[in-house]
């Protein structure tokens, strides 16, 4: 896990190294301060020598200023290193998600990924900053101060030897108890983010059904779960501070009591016991030792929280894409020929029944193929295998007479344009959205594909035309308009294969027919696969595939299927009857 996260430090290695180095220098000079104070008291104040007082006073001031300067520089390096580390980590997760196949993405919810890239990374950033600064400063301070204290008076310093292990056992018990609770907290954060995301995305539906109270109740329930888990964790962590304070005050009292007795016992003779300066120095070292222990306990608490976050981050970073480029990939797709050769597919390999079962299919380049089937008949699953969004479980799929697994994935997908069931537009102008298909497309190219998709007729009515700003998710355009813009975007790719996954369901039949006519006239060499609920959308196709429960029940033209396929005929007649009733 540490090795995985450390890879995100990269260009901030210098700051990551310099922060502990300057912290070590800060501690070195800070450790010298009590020794100089002892000299100032014993040789200057007790002897009434102003020259010695000035001498050690100036040295003390210089050492303190150097220590302060090193501390400030260390803080600057730590801030740069931790912020840069978090930035790189956020980028690494984001880039990793872009590489995921659909199968990988299915493992993580959107809300979970958002939590990992925000809350979890913030926790790791804070822990990283504490590790390269405080987690370095505190142990060095502890060891050096203990060494100096033992050098002054070994017997008194045995107090620390008893206190520190007791403190360590207590901290370990707290860590083991709290870590599982924080794991539950961050999983609940995923659920909370999912509820917020779902509510905001569907806010119009929520309001139209007056379900605000129900949504508030869902939110409150999850929020209360987070509250209860956090309170439980904090109640356990609360023992950390009393434990530290008990150790601090016990050590201070024992040092004061035993140290004072030692000074009195020697009767002022420094050769026989502890001098006043040494006692003050020992007391200062006591404070340094105990403060370093307190800071270490804070680091441990932060690490407890960050550990749960780090595990969640590494879960994403260590996820390997289920789709890999072959060692010697094919970069050119010759044509739009498609062949399904005994294809079996399942999203879950342990599933009892495959989603697609022994599918055999031949499509020639330039053909228009219709796909008809009921809900859950695996129409979308069928076409998602063509651009290799998923890999087949058995069999093979050929595009341009080459197995899709032998292609360079990017090259294959550049030749397959797919308009998914769920049409997505991004915030930006219409032009910016359409140029997802071709970033170098001219205004003339954009207008041409919009004419093919029958989108130009409504775009021209907008005051800003193609520069009209699309809100996030395309909320300021209708469903039919969104579908036509998505079709235009796909056409800009100039693909060899065009797949429309129920992508004209929100447009009227007249516009649907106009789009299909434009396809036949303008892109005759492109293989067109049209998934539709309306038979009218596919009845002119060269072939119509009838799917049912993941199996091809019939293939043929409209007239042939009306004679040979009961399923197709029933769908056609029910839609025809519905149309007649509406008239």
Go through each PLM region and give its residues.
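A short amphipathic helical element positioned immediately N-terminal to and/or at the very start
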Residues: 1-13, 113
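Transmembrane helix-loop-helix hairpins at lipid-water interfaces of multipass membrane proteins
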Residues: 10, 16-73, 77, 150-155, ...
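An intracellular "coupling" helix at the cytosolic face of ABC transporter transmembrane type-1 domains
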Residues: 11-13, 99-103, 119-132, 136, ...
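Hydrophobic alpha-helical transmembrane bundles that constitute the permease/transmembrane domains
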Residues: 20, 24-32, 65-72, 124-127, ...
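Hydrophobic/aromatic residues in alpha-helical transmembrane segments
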Residues: 33, 37, 74, 78, ...
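Short intracellular "coupling" helices and adjacent cytoplasmic loop segments at the cytosolic face
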Residues: 47, 83, 91-115, 119-121, ...
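Helix-loop-helix
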Residues: 49-53, 148-163, 171, 232-311, ...
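ABC-type nucleotide-binding domain
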Residues: 331-583
């Amino acid at each position: 896990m540490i090795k995985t996260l450390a890879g995100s430090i990269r260009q901030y290695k210098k700051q990551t190294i310099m922060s502990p180095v300057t912290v070590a220098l800060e501690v070195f000079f800070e450790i010298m301060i009590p020794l100089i104070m002892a000299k100032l008291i014993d040789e200057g104040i007790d002897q009434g020598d102003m020259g010695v007082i000035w001498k050690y006073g100036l040295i003390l001031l210089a050492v303190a200023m150097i220590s302060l300067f090193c501390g400030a520089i260390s803080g600057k390096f730590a801030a740069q290193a931790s912020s840069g580390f978090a930035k790189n980590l956020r980028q690494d997760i984001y880039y990793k998600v872009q590489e995921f196949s659909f199968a990988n993405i299915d493992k993580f919810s959107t809300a979970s990924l958002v939590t990992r890239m925000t809350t979890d990374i913030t926790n790791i950033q804070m822990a990283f900053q504490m590790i390269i600064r405080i987690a370095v400063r505190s142990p060095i301070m502890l060891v050096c101060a203990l060494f100096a204290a033992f050098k002054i008076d070994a017997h008194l310093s045995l107090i620390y030897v008893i206190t520190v292990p007791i403190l360590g056992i207590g901290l370990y018990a707290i860590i083991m108890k709290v870590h599982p609770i924080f794991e539950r907290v961050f999983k609940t954060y995923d659920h909370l983010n999912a509820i917020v995301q779902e509510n905001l995305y569907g806010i119009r539906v929520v309001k139209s059904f007056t379900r605000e109270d129900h949504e508030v109740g869902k939110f409150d329930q999850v929020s209360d779960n987070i509250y209860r888990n956090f309170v439980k964790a904090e109640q356990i962590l609360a023992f950390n501070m009393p434990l530290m304070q008990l150790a601090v005050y016990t050590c201070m009292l024992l040092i004061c009591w035993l140290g004072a007795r030692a000074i009195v016992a020697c009767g002022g003779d420094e050769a026989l016991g502890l001098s006043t300066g040494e006692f003050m120095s020992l007391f200062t070292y006591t404070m340094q030792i105990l403060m370093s222990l307190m800071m270490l306990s804070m680091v441990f608490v932060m690490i407890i929280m960050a550990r749960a976050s780090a595990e969640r981050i590494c879960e994403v970073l260590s996820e390997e894409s289920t789709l890999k480029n072959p060692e010697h990939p094919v970069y050119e797709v010759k044509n739009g020929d498609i062949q399904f050769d005994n294809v079996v597919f399942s999203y879950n390999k342990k599933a009892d029944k495959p989603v697609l079962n022994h599918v055999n299919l031949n499509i020639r380049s330039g053909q228009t193929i219709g796909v008809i089937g009921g809900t859950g008949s695996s129409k979308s699953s069928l076409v998602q295998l063509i651009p290799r969004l998923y890999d087949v479980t058995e069999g093979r799929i050929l595009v341009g007479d080459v197995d899709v697994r032998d292609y360079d994935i990017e090259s294959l997908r550049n030749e397959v344009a797919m308009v998914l069931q769920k049409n997505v537009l991004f915030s930006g102008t219409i032009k910016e959205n359409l140029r997802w298909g071709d970033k170098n497309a001219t205004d003339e190219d954009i207008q041409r594909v919009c004419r093919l998709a029958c989108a130009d007729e409504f775009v021209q009515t907008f005051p800003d035309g193609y520069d009209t700003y699309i809100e996030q998710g395309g909320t300021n355009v209708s469903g039919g308009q969104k579908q036509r813009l998505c079709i235009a975007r796909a056409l800009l790719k100039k693909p060899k294969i065009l797949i429309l996954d129920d992508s004209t369901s929100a447009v009227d039949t007249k516009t649907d027919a106009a789009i299909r006519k434009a396809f036949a006239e303008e892109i005759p060499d492109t293989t067109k696969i049209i998934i539709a609920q309306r038979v009218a959308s596919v009845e002119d196709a060269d072939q119509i595939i009838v799917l049912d429960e993941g199996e091809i029940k019939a293939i043929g033209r409209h007239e042939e299927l009306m004679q040979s396929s009961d399923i197709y005929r029933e769908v056609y007649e029910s839609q025809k009857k519905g149309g007649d009733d509406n008239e």
